[in-house]
Amino acid sequence: MVEPRATYRVQLHPGFTFDDAANLAEYFAELGISHLYCSPYLQATPGSTHGYDVVDHRRINEDLGGAAGHARMHSALREYGLGQVLDLVPNHMAIVSPYNPWWWDVLENGPASNYASYFDVDWETPEKRLRNSVLIPVLGDQYGVVLESGEIVLERDGAVLTVRYHEHRFPVAPRSLDTILSAAALRCGSDELAFLADTFGRLPLPTATDLESTRRRHRDKDVLRTFLTRLLREHREVGPALDAVISEINQRRDALHLLLERQNYRLAYWRAASHDLGYRRFFDINTLVGMRMEDEYVFADTHFLVLRWLADGTLDGVRVDHIDGLRDPEQYLRRLHQAQPEAWIVVEKILEPGEALRASWPIAGTTGYDFLNTVNGLLIDPAAERPLTRFYTEFTGEPADFTRVALEKKDLVMREILGSDLNRLTALFLEVCERHPRHRDYTRHELHEAICAAVAHLPVYRTYLREAAAAGEAEESARGPEHVNPDDQRLIDAAIEGAKAARSDIDQRLFDFLRDLLLLRLHGTFEVELAMRFQQLTGPVMAKAVEDTAFYCFNRFVALNEVGGDPARFGVGAVEFHRECETAQAHWPLRMLTTSTHDTKRSDDLRARLCLLSEIPDRWIAAVRGWSEMNRPWWRGGLSDHNAEYLFYQTLVGAWPLERERILDYMRKAAREAKLHTSWTAPNEEYERSLAGFVEGALDNAEFIADLKTFVAPLVWPGRVNALAQTLIKLTAPGVPDFYQGGELWNVTLVDPDNRRPVDYALRRRLLSEMRCATVEQVLARADEGLPKLWLIRQALDLRRRQPQLFGRDGDYNPLRARGTHAAHAIAFSRGGDAISIAPRLPLTLGGDWADTTMALPSGRWRNEMTGDIVDGGEIALAKLLARFPVALLSREERAS
């Protein structure tokens, strides 16, 4: 295994395949990247643009080039000394039929499927109508309406019968073939077909899940299907008879309904998913079903290829997607680690301010959202919080209390978006209460509301109590389930006390009982199940409510509205930044460091410019007042939304120049995500037309655009200075720097799909080549092309390549402090004793004049990797160090004798 020095993330899809990545291996190597970091590439839904919708863990995605293309990419990477890191998706699979063979088997055989236990499905739901079947919410209207319209049809392909609804296909349960085959046998006079009909009808019920019954069921149905295939081939009258019966069923809606009632699934109106779904999803995406990764055989079957690649060196590491969705994240990570102890494992884990990554997890660290928000906070002047807060409330009429907004959106998401998950948990809570006489009189409504309140008041994504130690974890086994991490105790106490305060109308003893359950003080099967499921629900609620809703409602200062961020946390000081870096070096020296990803709400360079507004709040407020007056006529039809308008102005300032279609698409998406006036599930066409009309009117307003350009112009270079500062910090802070595709040049993009547009690699290759002989002055002269950022990345990665010991697990971290008038505007630290990073912060108020500010360099001769200048240790003016390039990376060439 090779520890990554720097990773480069690519989004693989049919338009950018293994061969496209292979062709860039030389470029990545020249840039200084050590590992290509790939989006998921196991077999996904055909045409997938992202790969997170895996349908088959045993195959490589054919859309990307399949096994042959994968081998070519691996060979090309190896030729240039590059390793590979893969994004893993253990939490869920796509269930788009018929592409997922395991799910197809589940729909065909119900609880008796060999794969029924692979998926997080509630077969024993309290509702009789849904018991032992899977709700499939794909219909565009009520089931009966769709059935009568003839949109659901029975079809045959050889001996295989399927149900089709537009592009959706579903299997027909083997036992339910009896009536179809029997009718066809009568029609064509076939005794053999009649025999098959009787035999299909005598297959074990799908609810017979004992080993003998399931074995007989699967053996017999396969044999019977083979006989049916032979019969269709050898007796030409059978096929037409079968087709005639199928045609009759399609014409007789009652007959088709009776057939559908015998299936192991229940076709339903898509809106039913919000409250009646019987399986755990990835967030609210009905086609992504949760996996029971806690079961060892599920882990083994889903990780066969990945573990082989880790063993043979094809992969050096993995990124684990949505770790909080798993029932037992620590167990999962230990299995990965035990399979390949040297593998570099990072997890997509959102840490709330003050929350620490679990030290017991055998990983390198997170994927870097915590780092992203810390660095972002460095670029923000906290003094602007009061004026910006006051103006936001004045201009929009919206409350400036983000905690309140987040709580409201959690409640909204639980009730309207994740209602199915909440209802399943409520039903389980009711079952638990029935087993405890002191609590059995609580109503379903009370239990529902208590869970809602507790989930809403949990201050983090989730807790990590474990129901039992994984096999082989002797120390954990000895401690038993009674052991509760103090962090979990504190968090659950906070959730319960917050819930009590918010819902004084609910019997407080119910909350105390819920606390005992969540802390595993009651050890029954149902009691433990409740605690485990609660933990799996809180993460999706937080993500959907905060990241995907509140972040689009609370627009006070959107530079703070980033994945893993807290909009109420206005800025990060140098002391806090250094403390977090020291902690990282001590505990997570190989964590991933990122500033942009495929999931960020705004790219790093866009945020870097937006952060400048915190340095000029008065100018910004005056500008917005003027712009609002200029654009007042474009709000028509009596509709206006000043919160959306404020988001619009911030977005334009951060991303200007911005194509019309991009801002229109973004504003529509932001409005739907906010769920205030319109949403994805209930689009408000009148509101959306009004919003689009306002945006179009503003963009066509020559006076406004001229004033916008005048405002933005003096922010362009300081914004780039901020971008270079955060890039240098990422390149040299404790951890492994990651670069999102295309981000080696200025990267000004909005949330997906805007940040997943094609990257011009021909341009990047050309610029990298042209830089080989360039001076730093020539690089800066071509700043509009992005050369300063490309230069910084190449130079810093080259130093990491030459002296890896300075930056890895053994490279210590020491804060450095400037002296003088503008000392607070410098952020500096040393790595491994022989490398020093120096970057400016708050460049607008600095004004480019460092005055008497100095930095004390350790003794010896130091080379500035950005400029080639040599300086001697001792007190040196920052004006001199940063005269030729906005940031400095010094490497010690020799120590003092």
Located regions from the model:
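Conserved, well-structured beta-alpha core segment at the onset of a catalytic domain
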Residues: 67-85, 93, 97, 104
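Conserved short loop/turn motifs at secondary-structure junctions
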Residues: 91, 320-326, 781
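Active-site region of glycoside hydrolase catalytic domains
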Residues: 96-172
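Active-site microenvironment for binding and transforming phosphate-containing groups
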Residues: 459
